[in-house]
């Protein structure tokens, strides 16, 4: 009986999260917001800073200097199974106001042998666990760029994993930040142009972060009237 009551309470908390204020509403009211970015090398280190730094700068410019801070809590080469294992220490312990998740590109890495079904379970677990542990935390899912060259060969079914992210965002009622179409337009200009943004064929550089990724994040999270 206690177990059933606990589960019902947890579900109630998760459901009420849909009606709570989000990142922008809190910034408008002058509340400091800490964003945790959780994912692969595309969201970590120099790659992550390439787009999170301008995103944070723009939000601070609009809503108040130093209101927005962020932590890059992911790790290069990791995938959603690692994400589940390290969620408590890397994300929940930081009590974030918003979390941006992306593991799709490495879930698709064939050597990790992570099926779309397992990746979906991992992603849904992370969303549910964050909602249960950190009330009022807004969650965003990211679909990143396509790789080219040998990096693409290691991920023959990447489209299926990215499709799962889109489906999960809709199912869970979280905001999807889908960069894929923008990167397709860059790639349509030719591989040489694409590599000016993604030199090694998989990791966007500072130019890619600032010119392709950051503007679309702001477009998705800011109210339409403020763009």
For every predicted segment, state its role:
Residues 91-101, 105:
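Proline-aspartate-enriched helix->loop->beta-strand connector
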Residues 41-45, 75-81, 105-110, 145-149, ...:
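Solvent-exposed loop/turn segments at secondary-structure junctions
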Residues 21-23, 144-227:
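Catalytic His-Asp segment of secreted/periplasmic serine-dependent ester chemistry enzymes
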Residues 2-10:
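Sec-dependent signal peptide recognition
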Residues 10-18:
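Hydrophobic h-region of N-terminal signal peptides that target proteins for export
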Residues 102-106, 129-162:
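Active-site segments of SGNH/GDSL-like serine hydrolases
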Residues 18-76, 86-95:
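Serine-esterase "nucleophile elbow" of acetyl-processing enzymes
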Residues 115-124, 157-162:
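Charged helix-capping and loop-helix junction motifs
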């Amino acid at each position: 009986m206690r177990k059933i009551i606990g589960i019902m309470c947890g579900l109630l908390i998760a459901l009420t999260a849909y009606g709570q204020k989000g990142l922008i509403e809190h910034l408008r009211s002058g509340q400091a917001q800490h964003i945790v970015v959780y994912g692969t090398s595309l969201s970590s280190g120099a790659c992550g800073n390439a787009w999170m730094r301008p995103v944070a700068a723009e939000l601070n410019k609009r809503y108040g200097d130093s209101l927005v801070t962020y932590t890059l809590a992911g790790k290069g080469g990791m995938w959603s199974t690692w994400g589940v294992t390290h969620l408590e220490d890397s994300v929940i312990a930081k009590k974030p106001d918003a979390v941006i998740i992306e593991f799709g590109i490495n879930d698709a890495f064939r050597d990790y042998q992570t099926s779309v079904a397992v990746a979906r379970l991992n992603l849904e677990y992370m969303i549910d666990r964050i909602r249960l542990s950190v009330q009022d935390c807004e969650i965003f899912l990211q679909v990143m760029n396509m790789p080219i060259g040998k990096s693409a060969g290691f991920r023959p079914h990447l489209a299926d994993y990215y499709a799962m992210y889109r489906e999960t965002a809709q199912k869970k009622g979280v905001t999807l930040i889908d960069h894929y179409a923008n990167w397709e337009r860059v790639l349509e200009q030719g591989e040489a142009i694409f590599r000016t943004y993604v030199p090694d064929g998989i990791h966007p550089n500072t130019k890619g972060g600032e010119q392709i990724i950051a503007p679309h994040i702001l477009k998705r999270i800011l109210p339409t009237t403020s763009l």
